[in-house]
Design a protein with these regions (language model features):
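Active-site-proximal helices and loops of the catalytic beta/alpha 8
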Residues: 1-212
Length: 212
């Protein structure tokens, strides 16, 4: 109530300048769904390895006005059969939720259909969203470092606030096995960081130089 009442607006334009103009017009008194980020994730899911993952945050509210960004993957307007259909492909939904849930900036919003399913069918993504929510709650603290050196594999790193926190999300759209090196810190040398998403990759041991 009063000054503590939260509001968010929806302006369905994949045009950052128009979205910034909207925020200016309302005096930044409301936040805004980051439609640009949604369309970047949609394009990434459609183009697969032809999409340059280094561009995933380009032309987005979360990159330019992070305190005003409500990040989301899909919603009722983007699902199949709607007038504004732009549903992120299934294979990229875990990547997309890793982006919005493990990033420092933005207020992430889950889509009911991605979590519970649509039309009576149980969502295949609920378990990974639950896992990412757990990682967010326990580990996703501190500053964010985006490792954007390769078009087909990137990493989102949270540096942590104490010895128990910090995480790295590695995202790839390549059909081939890719590698990426992330500097974790020499103080964490010898630690074993667990792979928690159930992929085929093994746990990672931080080397003596603090790299993973």
């Amino acid at each position: 109530h009063g000054e503590k009442f939260y509001s968010v607006g929806e302006y369905w334009r994949n045009d950052l300048e128009k979205l910034k103009e909207y925020l200016d017009n309302v005096g930044y008194k409301t936040d805004l769904f980051d439609v640009g980020l949604h369309f970047n994730m949609y394009d990434a899911s459609k183009k697969k390895q032809d999409y340059d993952l280094r561009e995933i945050f380009e032309h987005t509210i979360v990159a330019t006005n992070p305190m005003a960004a409500v990040t989301f993957v899909d919603n009722h307007d983007s699902q199949k059969g709607s007038a504004l259909e732009s549903q992120v492909e299934n294979w990229f939904i875990p990547h997309s939720y890793a982006i919005i849930l493990l990033s420092k900036d933005g207020y992430p919003c889950l889509f009911y259909g991605d979590y519970y399913g649509i039309g009576g069918e149980k969502s295949p993504h609920q378990w990974i969203i639950d896992k990412l929510l757990e990682i967010r709650r326990i580990h996703a603290y501190g500053e964010q470092i985006n490792h954007l050196d390769d078009p087909n594999v990137i990493a989102i790193q949270r540096t942590g606030r104490d010895e128990r926190t910090g995480c790295v999300a590695v995202l790839s759209n390549s059909e081939e096995e890719e590698e990426i090196q992330v500097e974790i810190g020499k103080e964490k040398a010898g630690e074993v960081w667990q792979e928690v998403t159930g992929s085929e990759y093994e746990d990672v041991v931080i080397d003596e130089d603090g790299n993973a």
